[in-house]
Amino acid sequence: MAGRSGDSDEELLKTVRLIKFLYQSNPPPNPEGTRQARRNRRRRWRERQRQIRKISGWILSTYLGRSAEPVPLQLPPLERLNLDCSEDCGTSGTQGVGSPEILVESPAVLEPGTKE
């Protein structure tokens, strides 16, 4: 469950509980009061949320040795990607996506020099 060798599941769960507690300790602001009071409460709430995000990132990097940001997914080169409908077409709701059966010619309206 932890995803890295050396990390115990219990340590990960304890860290997640701590971060969850931090977020639960800062509920959304009360929507009552004057416009200025609501604006001030939202501003203070957003600042606390930013602090909680920073603290959560620090906790993850310090206790688990990983960053709060996800690791970017490595994609294959575009040259290796293709649309091939020769295998099992239509099972995922994409029937006819790769078949070039219908040819559409550009309409004469878009040709240069024609006016209505």
UniProtKB/Swiss-Prot annotation:
GO terms for biological process: mRNA transport; viral process. Asymmetrically arginine dimethylated at one site by host PRMT6. Methylation impairs the RNA-binding activity and export of viral RNA from the nucleus to the cytoplasm. Residues 23-48, 90-116 are annotated as: Disordered. Gene3D superfamilies: 6.10.140.630. Pfam families: REV (PF00424). InterPro entries: REV_protein (IPR000625). The RNA-binding motif binds to the RRE, a 240 bp stem-and-loop structure present in incompletely spliced viral pre-mRNAs. This region also contains the NLS which mediates nuclear localization via KPNB1 binding and, when the N-terminal sequence is present, nucleolar targeting. These overlapping functions prevent Rev bound to RRE from undesirable return to the nucleus. When Rev binds the RRE, the NLS becomes masked while the NES remains accessible. The leucine-rich NES mediates binding to human XPO1. The OYI isolate was taken from the blood of a healthy Gabonese individual. HIV-1 lineages are divided in three main groups, M (for Major), O (for Outlier), and N (for New, or Non-M, Non-O). The vast majority of strains found worldwide belong to the group M. Group O seems to be endemic to and largely confined to Cameroon and neighboring countries in West Central Africa, where these viruses represent a small minority of HIV-1 strains. The group N is represented by a limited number of isolates from Cameroonian persons. The group M is further subdivided in 9 clades or subtypes (A to D, F to H, J and K). Escorts unspliced or incompletely spliced viral pre-mRNAs (late transcripts) out of the nucleus of infected cells. These pre-mRNAs carry a recognition sequence called Rev responsive element (RRE) located in the env gene, that is not present in fully spliced viral mRNAs (early transcripts). This function is essential since most viral proteins are translated from unspliced or partially spliced pre-mRNAs which cannot exit the nucleus by the pathway used by fully processed cellular mRNAs. Rev itself is translated from a fully spliced mRNA that readily exits the nucleus. This is Protein Rev. The gene is rev.
